Every structure is written in structure tokens, then in C-alpha cells.
């Protein structure tokens, strides 16, 4: 499992008990240090945290995830990073967004790459403000196993 833009690793650590391995990637080094300390404190040996930009680090990760969790900054995912992330072809992606316009922009690319929105939910993490977190579950469309072809002869 990948937790990209993992911050201090909260989501990775919540998912660790049901995953063989969770790899978190975060650009803020102090957050990665905290994530490693938190995982060690909680005895979560299956968590690995990497400090670096997702755009660059993703090329160096040899593991293949079975699910990807995305929690990017307000500006969303770098346009060059998104195709790299989607190239893993995982069955499910969970995208957590704090800015609806960035989410909408990224969803166009994600859907063009064969994913569909299964569920979406807004979570009011900031009461009395206009800001909400949006959580979206995306599933990769699978071919139905056959192709219908209509041929007309004139």
C-alpha cells in the first residue's frame, strides 16, 4: 500500500494492521521523522516512510502497491506525478482532498486513465468555515471480457 503525501503518517499507521507493508512518501522531512517515530512507538514495523517529492521518489520505489491513498496539498497532485501514480494500475485509489477545485482537476485525468468514482463523501473537519475535506474512492474499470461489434455490409 502506498500513502502518498503522507504527512506524519497518520493514515499509513491506521492502515498498517491490515497491510503487509505501507510506504509513505512526504516532502516535509520533519513530518517523515515524526512518522517514523510514531510508527516505532506504536510497534508498526510494516511502515516505511520516505522523505522526498512524490514526483521524483515514485520512480525509485520498487514495490508495487495493491491500493494507493492520496492526500495531496491544496494545489493537488503535480500534473507529471499523476500519470506515474496511475501507471501502477491498482484496483482502488482513495483520494483525500482539502480543495474541491484541485480534486475536480485531478479527477479528469484519473477518470481518463480508466478509473471511476465509486463513492465520495465530504467531511467537515473545519466547522464554521467554508472548507471541507472530500474523500473519494476510485475503482479501476475492468473490461467485461467481450467486445460487441456490429458490422454492416452494404
Which residues does each PLM region occupy?
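Rossmann-like S-adenosyl-L-methionine
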Residues: 1-154
Amino acid at each position: 500500500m502506498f500513502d502518498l503525501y503522507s504527512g506524519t503518517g497518520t493514515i499509513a499507521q491506521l492502515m498498517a494492521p491490515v497491510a503487509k507493508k505501507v510506504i509513505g512518501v512526504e516532502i516535509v522531512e520533519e513530518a517523515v521523522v515524526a512518522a517514523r517515530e510514531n510508527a516505532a512507538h506504536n510497534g508498526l514495523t510494516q511502515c516505511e516512510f520516505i522523505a522526498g517529492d512524490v514526483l521524483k521518489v515514485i520512480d525509485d520505489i520498487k514495490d508495487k502497491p495493491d491500493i494507493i491513498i492520496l492526500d495531496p496539498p491544496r494545489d493537488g497532485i503535480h500534473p507529471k506525478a499523476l500519470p506515474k501514480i496511475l501507471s501502477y494500475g491498482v484496483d482502488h485509489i482513495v483520494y483525500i482532498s482539502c480543495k474541491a477545485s484541485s480534486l475536480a482537476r485531478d479527477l479528469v485525468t484519473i477518470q481518463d486513465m480508466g478509473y471511476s468514482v465509486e463513492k465520495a463523501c465530504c467531511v467537515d473537519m473545519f466547522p464554521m468555515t467554508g472548507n471541507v475535506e472530500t474523500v473519494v474512492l476510485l475503482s479501476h474499470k475492468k473490461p467485461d471480457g467481450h467486445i460487441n461489434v456490429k458490422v454492416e455490409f452494404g
